[in-house]
Curated annotation (Swiss-Prot):
Family of the protein in this entry: Belongs to the radical SAM superfamily. Biotin synthase family.
Keyword terms, alphabetized: 2Fe-2S, 4Fe-4S, Biotin biosynthesis, Iron, Iron-sulfur, Metal-binding, S-adenosyl-L-methionine, Transferase
Associated pathway: Cofactor biosynthesis; biotin biosynthesis; biotin from 7,8-diaminononanoate: step 2/2
Gene, per the UniProt record: bioB
Cofactor binding description: Binds 1 [4Fe-4S] cluster. The cluster is coordinated with 3 cysteines and an exchangeable S-adenosyl-L-methionine. Binds 1 [2Fe-2S] cluster. The cluster is coordinated with 3 cysteines and 1 arginine.
Residues that, per the record, bind [4Fe-4S] cluster: 58, 62, 65
One GO MF term: iron ion binding
Swiss-Prot/TrEMBL catalytic activity: (4R,5S)-dethiobiotin + (sulfur carrier)-SH + 2 reduced [2Fe-2S]-[ferredoxin] + 2 S-adenosyl-L-methionine = (sulfur carrier)-H + biotin + 2 5'-deoxyadenosine + 2 L-methionine + 2 oxidized [2Fe-2S]-[ferredoxin]
An annotated GO BP: biotin biosynthetic process
Name listed for the protein in its UniProt record: Biotin synthase
Assembly description: Homodimer.
EC supergroup of this enzyme: transferase
Amino acid sequence: MTSSDLTPRQNWTREEIAAIYDLPLDQLFARALAVKAAHWADGAVQKSQLLSIKTGGCAENCGYCSQSASFKTGLKAEKLLPVEEVVDAARRAKANGADRFCMGAAWRSLKDRDLPKVAEMISAVKAEGLETCVTLGMLEEGQAEALKEAGLDYYNHNLDTSREYYSTVVTTRTFDDRIETLGRARQAGIKLCCGGILGMGESRSDRVGLIHELSLLSPHPESVPVNKLVPIEGTPLANSEELDTLELARAIAVCRIVFPKSWVRLSAGRETMSAEGQALCILAGANSIFVGDRLLTTANPAMDKDARLLESVGGGCSKC
């Protein structure tokens, strides 16, 4: 570990990140573990829970997503959930040990007509003693401020992949559209949850590029989710080759080094991994997971499995 590893840097070069990414695995893990020990000495693992508050029918054509109206995945579009149903889910999440509750809506952007109801959800979940997070697509001027006023802590808006590979995955929006919405959320004083998806056919250079783009956000995202692609029948990426677990762990270790003070979340795709593979990713630097049996429309490990996983790596809950 170098002294620069202890302080978040806004001046990472792509070449520097690539050099770290390509380190022998033992050296990479040793460096990541030293950073994790310096900033997260208790070894605790933060737990979030995710709920789809509006499922299906999205106008975007993200090649990985079951909720796009562009693909035949068998998923039916649904209306925005009642506030009471969302609050009930938040209470169950808290009872299960989650300290952050994330609400996701499948649409291109937040419409002003839906803003009051979403704001009510945020306020109600916040009143239950949970941190709040939403993922609502692109934001227009003034919307982020309204969400902040309602009590929003985090806005999730992933960059997905590198700038160069982005148009291979989605063509209904641009990489810079994502950057613009992140800027709106940050300007309103909302913390950022921003990461990407690995295993979409991208190269290692693209993974380096994603991490580099994230490092240019100032300040860094407070939460960096690292997702492993869950191939879904009917989507363009349904037949993607499965990402190697060691490659996923390598990416997580690099994220831990580049984002020393951020939560690095082992996110989607855990249900396809062995307990040993998940433990490796936590040991490599991840200190946050999603709990609950579903992540929007994909499966997630059962609570008892996660309890055994966290016990095996010695990671309790950070705030519970």
